[in-house]
């Protein structure tokens, strides 16, 4: 198929039909009305706005997320607007037969699930202030301005839908910490800036590199002296891309995007442009592996893998997931300091969000029992030389004048070191780089798992079966692009 034939086919797929449009927009009107009626009783000066892709008409078929913002005058106290929003949001969701729950991001808000004509909608009711563009009291105050900007500047909503479908299919959609991908707003801004989905892909392949700056409103030359100043401003983020928020030049819309996801997007874009196919919009989700396949893989695998089970804290994923990744990185450093070479690490969780898992892969599972240790030169400070000699006894002097010896290695297998974590207290876990909440919840609960135990987990929990499939088989994107690059 030609590029245009593929895009024509996908344009039809990503555009909601009239029946679905009436379903989604009809529900949005209902929840908006329920919230508005209750909010006006409590604060006549507050307003209600529908926010997000449904409001901006960039949602994909199957959409189930509806975001409602309660917008308050700036003179209201934050605790007051949160309390009012929690009340009206809970009442509105329950009035439609749904279940409400209190959530927390920058401040508390109400989330919930509501059944409507056979579809379950995820509803968020969020408080914010009525601010001017660029004025921020709370981080979510920008969001209504994002709505207005997209509505005013996005000429063809289907181009944003194409981009969203593309990044969703390659598992790069969403700014949450587990994904570190492209938010919906970022997709919309890219469609505005480049004019079309195809042009986004072509420019990504041609120009996107870590630190590349996208400036929709010409802030460079007005707010910033040059592009170097932009990069300096955001250097603490170590950004994959810098997309200056049109409503707030001090914010990088792409701050959540990781270099891994940037690379995956460029690979997918290059492969799609070279050999267009509808497959790029339909995704290749890994099927859960069976326990039998896990056993077989571990028997045949030439490398060495250690699996560690921890107990997750009772926190939202955005809190515990970065701590799980931090733990994997920290343990890798601890192991490397002892001479082990960690080739890669992988983290996953069970479907109940009770346990997390760190998989560490080594090229070799055993080190020599003796290790070479090089000490100071003989002419350096006396205490350093004395310390080395007294610690090791026998030594020789190398050609460059440094003292050297060989000593018995403290840890021969990675399990020798990691085994200290089993049943360990909080302080020991913290000293090995566990995140603070993870160290608290995992105190006395850390276990090293055998291949057999991993196989049993795969059979018991499809979420873990999928995560193990990705670890064992590699990135699903590789199957899509390998014959097209």
Swiss-Prot record:
Keyword Iron-sulfur belongs to the record: no
Name of a matching Pfam family: tRNA_NucTransf2
SUPFAM superfamilies in the cross-refs: Nucleotidyltransferase, PAP/Archaeal CCA-adding enzyme, C-terminal domain, PAP/OAS1 substrate-binding domain
Keyword field: ATP-binding, Magnesium, Metal-binding, Nucleotide-binding, Nucleotidyltransferase, RNA repair, RNA-binding, Transferase, tRNA processing
InterPro entries for this protein: CAA_C, CCA-adding_arc, CCA_tRNA_nucleotrans_2, NT_2-5OAS_ClassI-CCAase, NT_sf, NuclTrfase_I-like_C, Polymerase_NTP_transf_dom, tRNA_NucTransf2
Catalysis performed (reactions): a tRNA precursor + 2 CTP + ATP = a tRNA with a 3' CCA end + 3 diphosphate; a tRNA with a 3' CCA end + 2 CTP + ATP = a tRNA with a 3' CCACCA end + 3 diphosphate
Cofactor(s) required for function per UniProt: Mg(2+)
List of residues binding CTP: 53, 56, 146, 164, 173
Positions of ATP binding: 53, 56, 146, 164, 173
Biological function: Catalyzes the addition and repair of the essential 3'-terminal CCA sequence in tRNAs without using a nucleic acid template. Adds these three nucleotides in the order of C, C, and A to the tRNA nucleotide-73, using CTP and ATP as substrates and producing inorganic pyrophosphate. tRNA 3'-terminal CCA addition is required both for tRNA processing and repair. Also involved in tRNA surveillance by mediating tandem CCA addition to generate a CCACCA at the 3' terminus of unstable tRNAs. While stable tRNAs receive only 3'-terminal CCA, unstable tRNAs are marked with CCACCA and rapidly degraded.
Family: Belongs to the tRNA nucleotidyltransferase/poly(A) polymerase family. Archaeal CCA-adding enzyme subfamily.
Name of protein: CCA-adding enzyme
Organism this protein belongs to: Methanopyrus kandleri (strain AV19 / DSM 6324 / JCM 9639 / NBRC 100938)
């Amino acid at each position: 198929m030609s590029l245009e034939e593929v895009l024509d086919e996908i344009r039809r797929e990503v555009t909601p039909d009239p029946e679905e449009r009436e379903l989604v927009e009809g529900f949005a009107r209902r929840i908006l009305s329920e919230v508005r009626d209750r909010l006006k009783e409590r604060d006549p000066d507050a307003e209600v706005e529908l926010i997000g892709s449904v409001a901006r008409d960039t949602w994909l078929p199957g959409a189930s997320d509806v975001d409602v913002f309660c917008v308050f005058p700036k003179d209201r106290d934050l605790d007051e607007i949160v309390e009012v929003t929690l009340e009206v949001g809970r009442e509105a969701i329950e009035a439609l037969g749904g279940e409400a729950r209190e959530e927390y991001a920058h401040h508390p808000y109400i989330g919930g699930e509501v059944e409507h004509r056979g579809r379950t909608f995820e509803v968020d009711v969020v408080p914010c202030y009525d601010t001017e563009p660029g004025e921020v009291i709370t981080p979510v105050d920008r969001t209504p301005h994002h709505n207005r900007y997209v509505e005013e500047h996005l000429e063809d909503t289907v181009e944003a839908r194409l981009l969203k479908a593309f990044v969703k299919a390659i598992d790069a959609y969403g700014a949450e910490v587990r994904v570190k991908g492209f938010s919906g707003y970022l997709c919309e801004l890219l469609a505005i800036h480049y004019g079309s989905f195809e042009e986004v892909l072509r420019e990504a392949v041609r120009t996107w590199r870590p630190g590349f700056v996208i400036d929709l409103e010409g802030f460079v030359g007005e707010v910033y002296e040059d592009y170097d100043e932009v990069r300096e401003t955001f250097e603490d983020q170590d950004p994959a891309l810098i997309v200056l928020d049109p409503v707030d030049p001090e914010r990088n819309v792409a701050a959540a995007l990781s270099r891994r996801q940037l690379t995956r997007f460029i690979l997918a874009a290059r492969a799609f442009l070279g050999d267009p196919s509808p497959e790029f919009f339909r995704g290749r989700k890994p099927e859960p592996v069976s326990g039998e396949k896990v056993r077989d893989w571990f028997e045949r695998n030439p490398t060495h893998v250690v699996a560690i089970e921890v107990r997750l804290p009772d926190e939202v994923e955005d809190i515990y997931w970065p701590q799980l990744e931090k733990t994997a990185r920290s343990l890798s450093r601890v192991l490397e300091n002892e001479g082990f070479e960690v080739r890669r690490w992988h983290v996953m969780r069970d479907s109940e969000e009770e346990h997390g898992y760190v998989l560490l892969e080594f090229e070799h599972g055993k080190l020599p029992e003796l290790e070479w240790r090089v000490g100071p030169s003989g002419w350096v400070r006396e205490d350093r030389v004395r310390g080395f000699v007294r610690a090791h006894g026998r030594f020789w002097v190398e050609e460059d004048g440094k003292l050297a010896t060989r000593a018995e290695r403290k840890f021969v297998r990675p399990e020798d070191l990691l085994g200290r974590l089993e049943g360990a207290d909080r302080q020991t876990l913290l000293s090995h780089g566990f995140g603070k909440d993870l160290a608290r919840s995992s105190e006395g609960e850390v276990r090293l798992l055998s291949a057999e135990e991993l196989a049993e987990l795969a059979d018991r929990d499809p979420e873990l079966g999928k995560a193990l499939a990705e670890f064992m088989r590699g990135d699903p994107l590789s199957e899509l692009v390998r014959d097209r690059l």
